[in-house]
């Protein structure tokens, strides 16, 4: 029954929100965000705890402001995502402005493919639709299997409708397909700021230990494709902003695992730089730092705030390429 209700809620969002006038949808998203923030549920409290790592000197009043803005940013993502299938190509092109795009254009021109790695910032579905529409470049991503199957099918159909090739997340088999796409000069996009599986790579993130997927670095190392971190954010305009960061350097020395670790750390550093500039647009409503997971300093110990095995990038397996994650509970996780 719960699975059917979840599926129905997402279906309702896609079928009704896109029919609303845009100003109405914007106000609706802000109202839902403000009401959710006022309830001070687990997701909001976890968001504030995570933001406290990003802005460690912020007083409680500042953290409250950031978390409220964060929930508004998060609901803007959902309102946009429900409306994206109805947007015209012109609306998509006008809806995103990106800095340093030349890193992506130059990388594709080299013919080796490109790996884009993103944190849970802004609206990566809009960014993806912009790439396929403005640049005319299709790309490949992965999605975890969801329950019920009809919900998984909804998200696959949604992203395929935006011009993406969506692979089921099946560890090594997905990795092999992604590598083939890169060798043929294709583009691969992966959300890569959280991986609690055994294959996750430990990094320093805002001064504390966290784990992130090995996949983006492993794909770049194996295929020779450049790895480009990308960060996204909103401002007061209807246009989402973004930045393509410089290519992650491939270490000349070390074994495969050591080189992947260095590249994962450089990717994490790029994510941290973007998040520090726009903390309210980082939609991390789950535990991330290892101290929060193993009872170390900073652990909240709140019931029900345990890591979600179906959450972003949690699937393990050798060569795990990372994952856009799963929708999880409505209003709690980005897909």
State each model region's role:
Residues 94-98, 121, 148, 168-172, ...:
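A conditional alpha-helix N-cap/helix-loop micro-motif detector
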Residues 1-118, 135, 154, 161-163:
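Membrane-anchoring hydrophobic helices of lipid-metabolizing enzymes
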Residues 2-5, 30, 36, 68, ...:
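Non-catalytic C-terminal accessory region of glycerolipid acyltransferases
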Residues 45, 102, 125-126, 152-153, ...:
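Residue-level marker for well-ordered alpha-helical positions
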Residues 14, 48-49, 129, 156, ...:
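Short glycine-/small-residue-rich flexible loop motifs, especially phosphate/cofactor-binding loops
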Residues 110-171, 184, 198-201, 205:
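Catalytic core of membrane glycerolipid acyltransferases/transacylases, capturing the structured
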Residues 61-62, 142, 169, 230, ...:
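Residue-level detector of family-conserved "landmark" positions at structurally sensitive sites
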